[in-house]
Amino acid sequence: MQQRHLNRRQYFCELANTARTFYMEYLNTYIKLTPDTRVLEIGCGEGGNLLPFAEKGCQVTGIDICQSRIIEAQTFFTECHQQGTFICQDFLLTEEPKTEDERYDLILVHDVIEHIEPSNKRDFLLHIKHFFKQDGIAFFGFPAWQNPFGGHQQISVGPASKLPFIHLLPKPLYKVLLKTSGATTSKIGELMSIRVSRMTVEGFEQLVSEVGYNICKSTLWLINPHYKQKFHISPRRQWTFFASIPYLRNFYTT
């Protein structure tokens, strides 16, 4: 496990830096950020992605199912002298806004969809639609399942946390490798859950089409923007030819 997964303040700052440097510029074509802009992040964790939006004066709200992450988000925002509303709740159980003013201009769903159980993904996306303003947009980001660390094995410990593609091994062999590397039963359970909930580029495109979303922009990354914080290497978009190869592109899209 990388130190950044243990030091949550460092993790918060890294997410904020990536959002500030890349995500806000990426979204700039589609939304103008003002003090009236309402931003919701589903699965906000410590709130790092939301910090740059708060710094711009936006009204930010984060929802996460993990109480400790919500407490950390509140603490870190206070330390940064920024305002934010953070709610501990399962998003699928969150009550729909009753008025247009309560809805959101921008909804962030970053590194979340691959954790949603397959049977709940459709309901999850449909529920999100109730939170949009009439001209609202969503920003989705996720690692393609077959990419070198698409199984999130980096959050484990020992040699297995550094081995690419091991999540594609047969399940029994993968579990043995995690266990012999020192992973706890709960961590193995978490990684097995991600294995079940996996997300591919094609699966996502089909799912959002079925529930009536319009994709206004899609970018596949060979080296995704957050790798600059994680590994100090510059982002690189996927080459057009390789990005256009269905299924195979999941193996080299991060």
What feature does the model see in each segment?
Residues T29-Y30, F131, V211:
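Alpha-helical structural context
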Residues D111-H115:
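Short catalytic micro-motifs in class I SAM-dependent methyltransferases
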Residues E117, F132-K133:
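Helix-to-beta-strand junctions that scaffold the AdoMet/dcAdoMet cofactor pocket
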Residues N120-I128, I137-T254:
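S-adenosyl-L-methionine-dependent methyltransferase catalytic module, highlighting the catalytic core
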Residues T37, D135-G136:
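Surface-exposed loop/turn positions
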Residues E95-E96, I116-E117, F149:
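Activation segment
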Residues M1-E102, L106, H110, R122-L125, ...:
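Conserved N-terminal segment of class I S-adenosyl-L-methionine
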